[in-house]
Amino acid sequence: MIELDINASDKSLSHRAVIFSLLAKKPCFVRNFLMGGDCLSSLEIAQNLGARVENIAKNSFKITPPWALKEPRKILNCNNSGTSMRLYSGLLSAQKGLFVLSGDNSLNSRPMKRIIEPLKAFGTKILGREDNHFAPLVILGSPLKACDYESPIASAQVKSAFILSALQAQGTSTYRESELSRNHTEIMLKSLGANIKDQDGVLKISPLEKPLEAFDFKIANDPSSAFFFALACAILPKSRLLLKNVLLNPTRIEAFEVLKKMGTHIECVIKSKDLEIIGDIYIEHALLKAITIDQNIASLIDEIPALGIAMLFAKGKSVVKNAKDLRSKESDRIKALISNLKALGIECEEFEDGFYIEGLEDISQLKQRFSQIKPPIIKSFNDHRIAMSFAILTLMLPLEIDNLECANISFPQFKRLLNLFKKGSLHGN
């Protein structure tokens, strides 16, 4: 059995630890921070807003926030990070100053009206390109008034932007969403003194009466990153894997539950229940069966491309529905997944809010089909999750991926671990 501590700190928690420190007003410590491109964007923006960031150990920082955020002289560059842009928009909505947030071509093509509308409900002065649909975003910080908002989509980023504004508004605000999205923001902020109550799925957020408490967070391993190696174990015969020190928040492990329903043997062992649930995940290969995914999409949206690879080895027709938001990620992930699978000779098709994949009998059938075609170059579309999903197939096929380097956005150790996985030399790493 391979034991693997992926050393890939959770992306969601890393972003939030940096951004929330700016509301603490006292030094905060973030340990085991994810040194990927997206999270580094959040860290750099914090510095541009006046925070002092000191490197105190490997992947660990002391963040000393300013008493009042500084109006930056330059654009706040979010690069490829939608989390940075959306959460900072909420944070800055009530701060004194003019703030401009922009990103790369991919981020500036992603939908931003989904956060502009709830922020405007507070009275936020915010503008976006093309009638508020896209970044760059311009925010003129101003006093906010509490509001009630029902989000048409389940999105942790939208919810988090709303909460950060609500904490700075006059009066108690309420937020509803169609299904539960990731709840790290609520968990972390409540632990730091914020008054946030969940009443039958409706969040009630009261304004901060004092700065957030200073904190010392150690970030656990990211289940979304760990899932790529769970996928590898699920599709490689006779494989057994132990993923160590993984965040086991129930809103983050739905993809593991889906893989379990498909037939993979999976067991989670809880090791600690402090701020978040952390533990180990044991995975053992078994024959996979087809599945339909049409619920709890918000809790597994990031893992659907990888699940698409699992469906390739699940006998029968697998279907994904109600996942239109996949088209608004770093790439159109529905199109990216299906176009690459078709290039491999797989029977599959996309539709507006999902896709279907006709699974194969076994690996030998995939290798046989592969031998009958000219090996395609897999197009990552510069999307880290598409690149890593198809990279798992290189464990059994001589595939070339046009840009595996984009994995560094969320999982800088991925290529090294994948190579060690190929060599079967991961024990103890």
Curated annotation (Swiss-Prot):
Keyword Phosphoprotein attached = no
**Pathway per the UniProt entry:** Metabolic intermediate biosynthesis; chorismate biosynthesis; chorismate from D-erythrose 4-phosphate and phosphoenolpyruvate: step 6/7
Question: What functional role does this protein have?
Answer: Catalyzes the transfer of the enolpyruvyl moiety of phosphoenolpyruvate (PEP) to the 5-hydroxyl of shikimate-3-phosphate (S3P) to produce enolpyruvyl shikimate-3-phosphate and inorganic phosphate.
Gene name, per UniProt, is aroA
Q: What is this protein called?
A: 3-phosphoshikimate 1-carboxyvinyltransferase
What Gene Ontology cellular-component terms does the record carry?
A: cytoplasm
Q: Name the InterPro entries on file.
A: Enolpyruvate_Tfrase_dom, Enolpyruvate_Tfrase_sf, EPSP_synthase, EPSP_synthase_CS, RNA3'P_cycl/enolpyr_Trfase_a/b
Choose any GO biological process term that the UniProt entry carries and state it: chorismate biosynthetic process
State any single GO MF term. Answer: 3-phosphoshikimate 1-carboxyvinyltransferase activity
Catalyzed reactions: 3-phosphoshikimate + phosphoenolpyruvate = 5-O-(1-carboxyvinyl)-3-phosphoshikimate + phosphate
Active site residues according to the UniProt entry: D302 (proton acceptor)
Subcellular localization(s) per the UniProt record: Cytoplasm
Q: Which organism is it from?
A: Helicobacter acinonychis (strain Sheeba)
- Residue positions annotated to bind 3-phosphoshikimate are K11, S12, R16, S155, Q157, D302, K329
Q: What is the lineage of its organism?
A: Bacteria, Pseudomonadati, Campylobacterota, Epsilonproteobacteria, Campylobacterales
